[in-house]
Amino acid sequence: MRKILFGIFLTLNTVLSCIAQQKFEPLPMDPALRYGILDNKLTYYIRHNETEKERADFYIVQNVGAILEEDSQNGLAHFLEHIAFNGTKNYPGKGIINYLETIGVKFGANINAYTSLDETVYNLKAVPTYRSGIVDSCLLILHDWSSFISCEDDEIDKERGVILEEWRTRNTSDRRLWKKSSQILYEGSQYAKRDIIGDTAIILHFHPDSLRAYYKKWYRPDLQGIIIVGDVDVDYVENKIKEIFADIPERVNPATRIVYDLKKLDTTKVCILTDPEAKYTIGNITYRHDAMPSEIYASIVGYTTSVIDNLISKMVNARIDEVLKEKDCPFSYASMSYGSQVKSCDGYELMYVVKDNRCMEASEKILSLAEQVRRYGFTESELYRAKETTIASFEKAYTERTKAKNNSFVGEYKRNFTTFEPIPGIEWEFDAIKKILPSITTDIVNKRFADYFKTNQITVLMTAADKDKNLLPSENQLTQLIADREKIAASPYIDKAKNKPLVKKDPKPGKIVDIYHNPKLDYTMWTLSNGAKVIIKSTKLKNDEILMTAFSEGGISTVGDLSILSSAKIADNIIEANGLGDFDATQLDKALAGKNVTVSPSIAMYESKISGRSTIKDFKTMLQMTYLLQTSARKDPEAYASLMSQYETVLENRSADPMNDYRDSVQVLSSSRNSYTMPFKKENLSEVNEADAIKIFKSLFYCPEKFTYIFVGNLAEDSVKNEILSYIGGIKSSKSKQRGWIDRGIKHPSGFTKCEFSKTLSTPKSADYFSYMTDMEYNLKNKLQLAILRSILDYRYLESCREREGGTYGVAVRQSMSVVPTSSACLKIAFDTDPEKEALLSKIVKEEIDIIIKDGVRDDDFQKAKEALQKSFAESLLENGYWKGQLEHLEKYGWCDNPTYTETLAKITKEDIRQTLKTIVDAGNLLEIKMKPNK
């Protein structure tokens, strides 16, 4: 690694002056950040940010994780994370959650934590800060999580079942393969022994003192970082941190926080694994290197190296994207990236999803792409595009620096604490990138790429389904392929970019024939001469963001011929894969390099839609792409064949995952087995025809008179008028007589419907689904009552099914309302559990509903639910996406939330909620689906 860094250092010393004199000086810290270390060695980061008015995020980062467990503690780092929510010195029992939910901060969405191998992080997000007492309380919670978690015996015993159910839910094929591969590829290191969730036998039987020992040993201020970002008084918060955390002493003779190494390999390490529920055959080739020393990583040399690595990643993956579009490409997806493997080890990783069991061919192909770059290097045009894309992303971040969200800062500060990532701030970074990029040459990136492969620490992993075991290559074959890498055929790359305008000839502009202004919601609507409606709402919520949505009634429901239904279902993906106008998809990607713009079509059952996003500078490009979508969809047999091949790979082993049968059952039965909503499967591919898909797409999108185009963001009507008239008004009207959606009989089943089936499962579990449906008028009050009901059921199921019974990791409750084809409401409930507990939990789920109908809603649940909705509403007002959705809703249904939301919410009573639930249940339309393991 030192040779690699020294090579970069020498190459860049003509680019970056005085590096030698700096002796790897760390980059400056963002001056807008308040950073400090208390006498007890606790680190804190505080930043004032008003983007989210009267909101702040509070984090405590523990620079320890499962990797530090002793063998007898396997799984206890994660267990402790759970116990932290079950009682602390100042918040006994469920005090943390109960208090925070009274101010609208919800468990799960805003109150959460995670444990990884090397860190454990607790967070309180979007906390209201309109009272200093709330800030004090959140700091006290962080204080308790630091050193005063109660770890009471009874709470530990109750949580054992919850952890076991989390294991049951998360023990998927991917996780099993990851665990097995870690044991082999990381053999001889601590990383081979730990998997976070841990040993279930230990989880069920460990003595509470073992958990307390882990807590006492590793949760200490020198390994903890406090992060507070948001609408707070920085001086006040800093003083409160010093005051509140003063009672935590510096640890005397603390245990060393070891950074574990990986065992050095004597030869290429190959690991081939299968699992009965694996859906894909996946290859992974990694060239390991020692991690960059932290003092270099935090310096200008480390920063510049990261810039070079990112440029390489962009260029290599652009080449992969080209290859993926080839008809005979042996993999359906692939990527190459350089990054951290574990704390002590970086690596260059080649990942690919194999098509049609062509394992050796796919492995050789991905290596040939790497060899192509290593031997012949990158072209000037590729580097130019990568630089343009990079500078565009930095420019966007710089322009939006006063509108950045709290979580963007939190992520940077967390990585600074755990990995020493520099945090100089976007002002410094934007200035630096403008100086660094022009001086990075193809020679520099080519040298860096070649150095990726100068290591003998190589691992190869291939995973697949059990049924494909005999089709996999041997370890010897893969080892030999790596050894013979330099013999693989590779030819120089030919860049086939098109240097021409997106739109060959600008269309004749349309005219505005009618103007309407809505003063309440402050938007303007134009009706254009081609029949299109355009809605514009100017906001300053973001400095450089414009969102677009264009929608039309119709969608898949307009397709009457069932023989072309499969073509209709994936027509939008076919159009995107084929490119637009004179540009195939690869050429289009290259033409858009350096532009912050996305435009994509979608076809739902009852509507067709175009979604877009751009900066101010790239607004015209967004309109041009929209124009091309609605005038210039193209046929591309090779791209189409490649897409079909990718679909085949995805769908081939779809049934291997037993949860797909469960999800399919929900989809099929929820719509009464309607042909239009059947899951898309491999056999449907033979029904797809490119010409049919394009014809369907044109019938749905080549009709501007049926579309309403909504633009929300930092745009002024006068500045965008001419471009809208050209690229929206210039789309020719159609002569289609089709108007709106068609009722195809898709409906929730009436009465009681039950489906119970069994599957062979690697991890025994039962999965239950309940869906209650009733006719209900679609209005704001009913919509809010359903949202409140969902939260109330969330609270009750958390208390009964998870906390009291330890029977499930969580009960998912969802509510929905439909207008098309009929106005209705649906309440959906789902959970996974131990098969032995399924009957009990199923009974509890229904009992909780019966209790609410009989006894009414608990007052504290009701108030918490309403407070959370009001808080969420206030936050949504600061998002362009919210306003875009509101204007779309208004145009479709004649009303939207905004004008009367708070007033309507305030008037809802507990009796309203009880009656709403009673109405849903009394309708008698219950769909019940149960999947159980084969005995």
Each model region followed by its residue ranges:
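Peptidyl-prolyl cis-trans isomerase
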Residues: Y99, F148-I156, T169, I440-R448, ...
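Proteolytic maturation boundary segments
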Residues: C18-I46, D233-A298, G302-V307, S313-N317, ...
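Hydrophobic, small-residue-rich alpha-helical packing segments that form membrane-like cores
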Residues: E155, R160-L223, I227-V229, V234-I241, ...
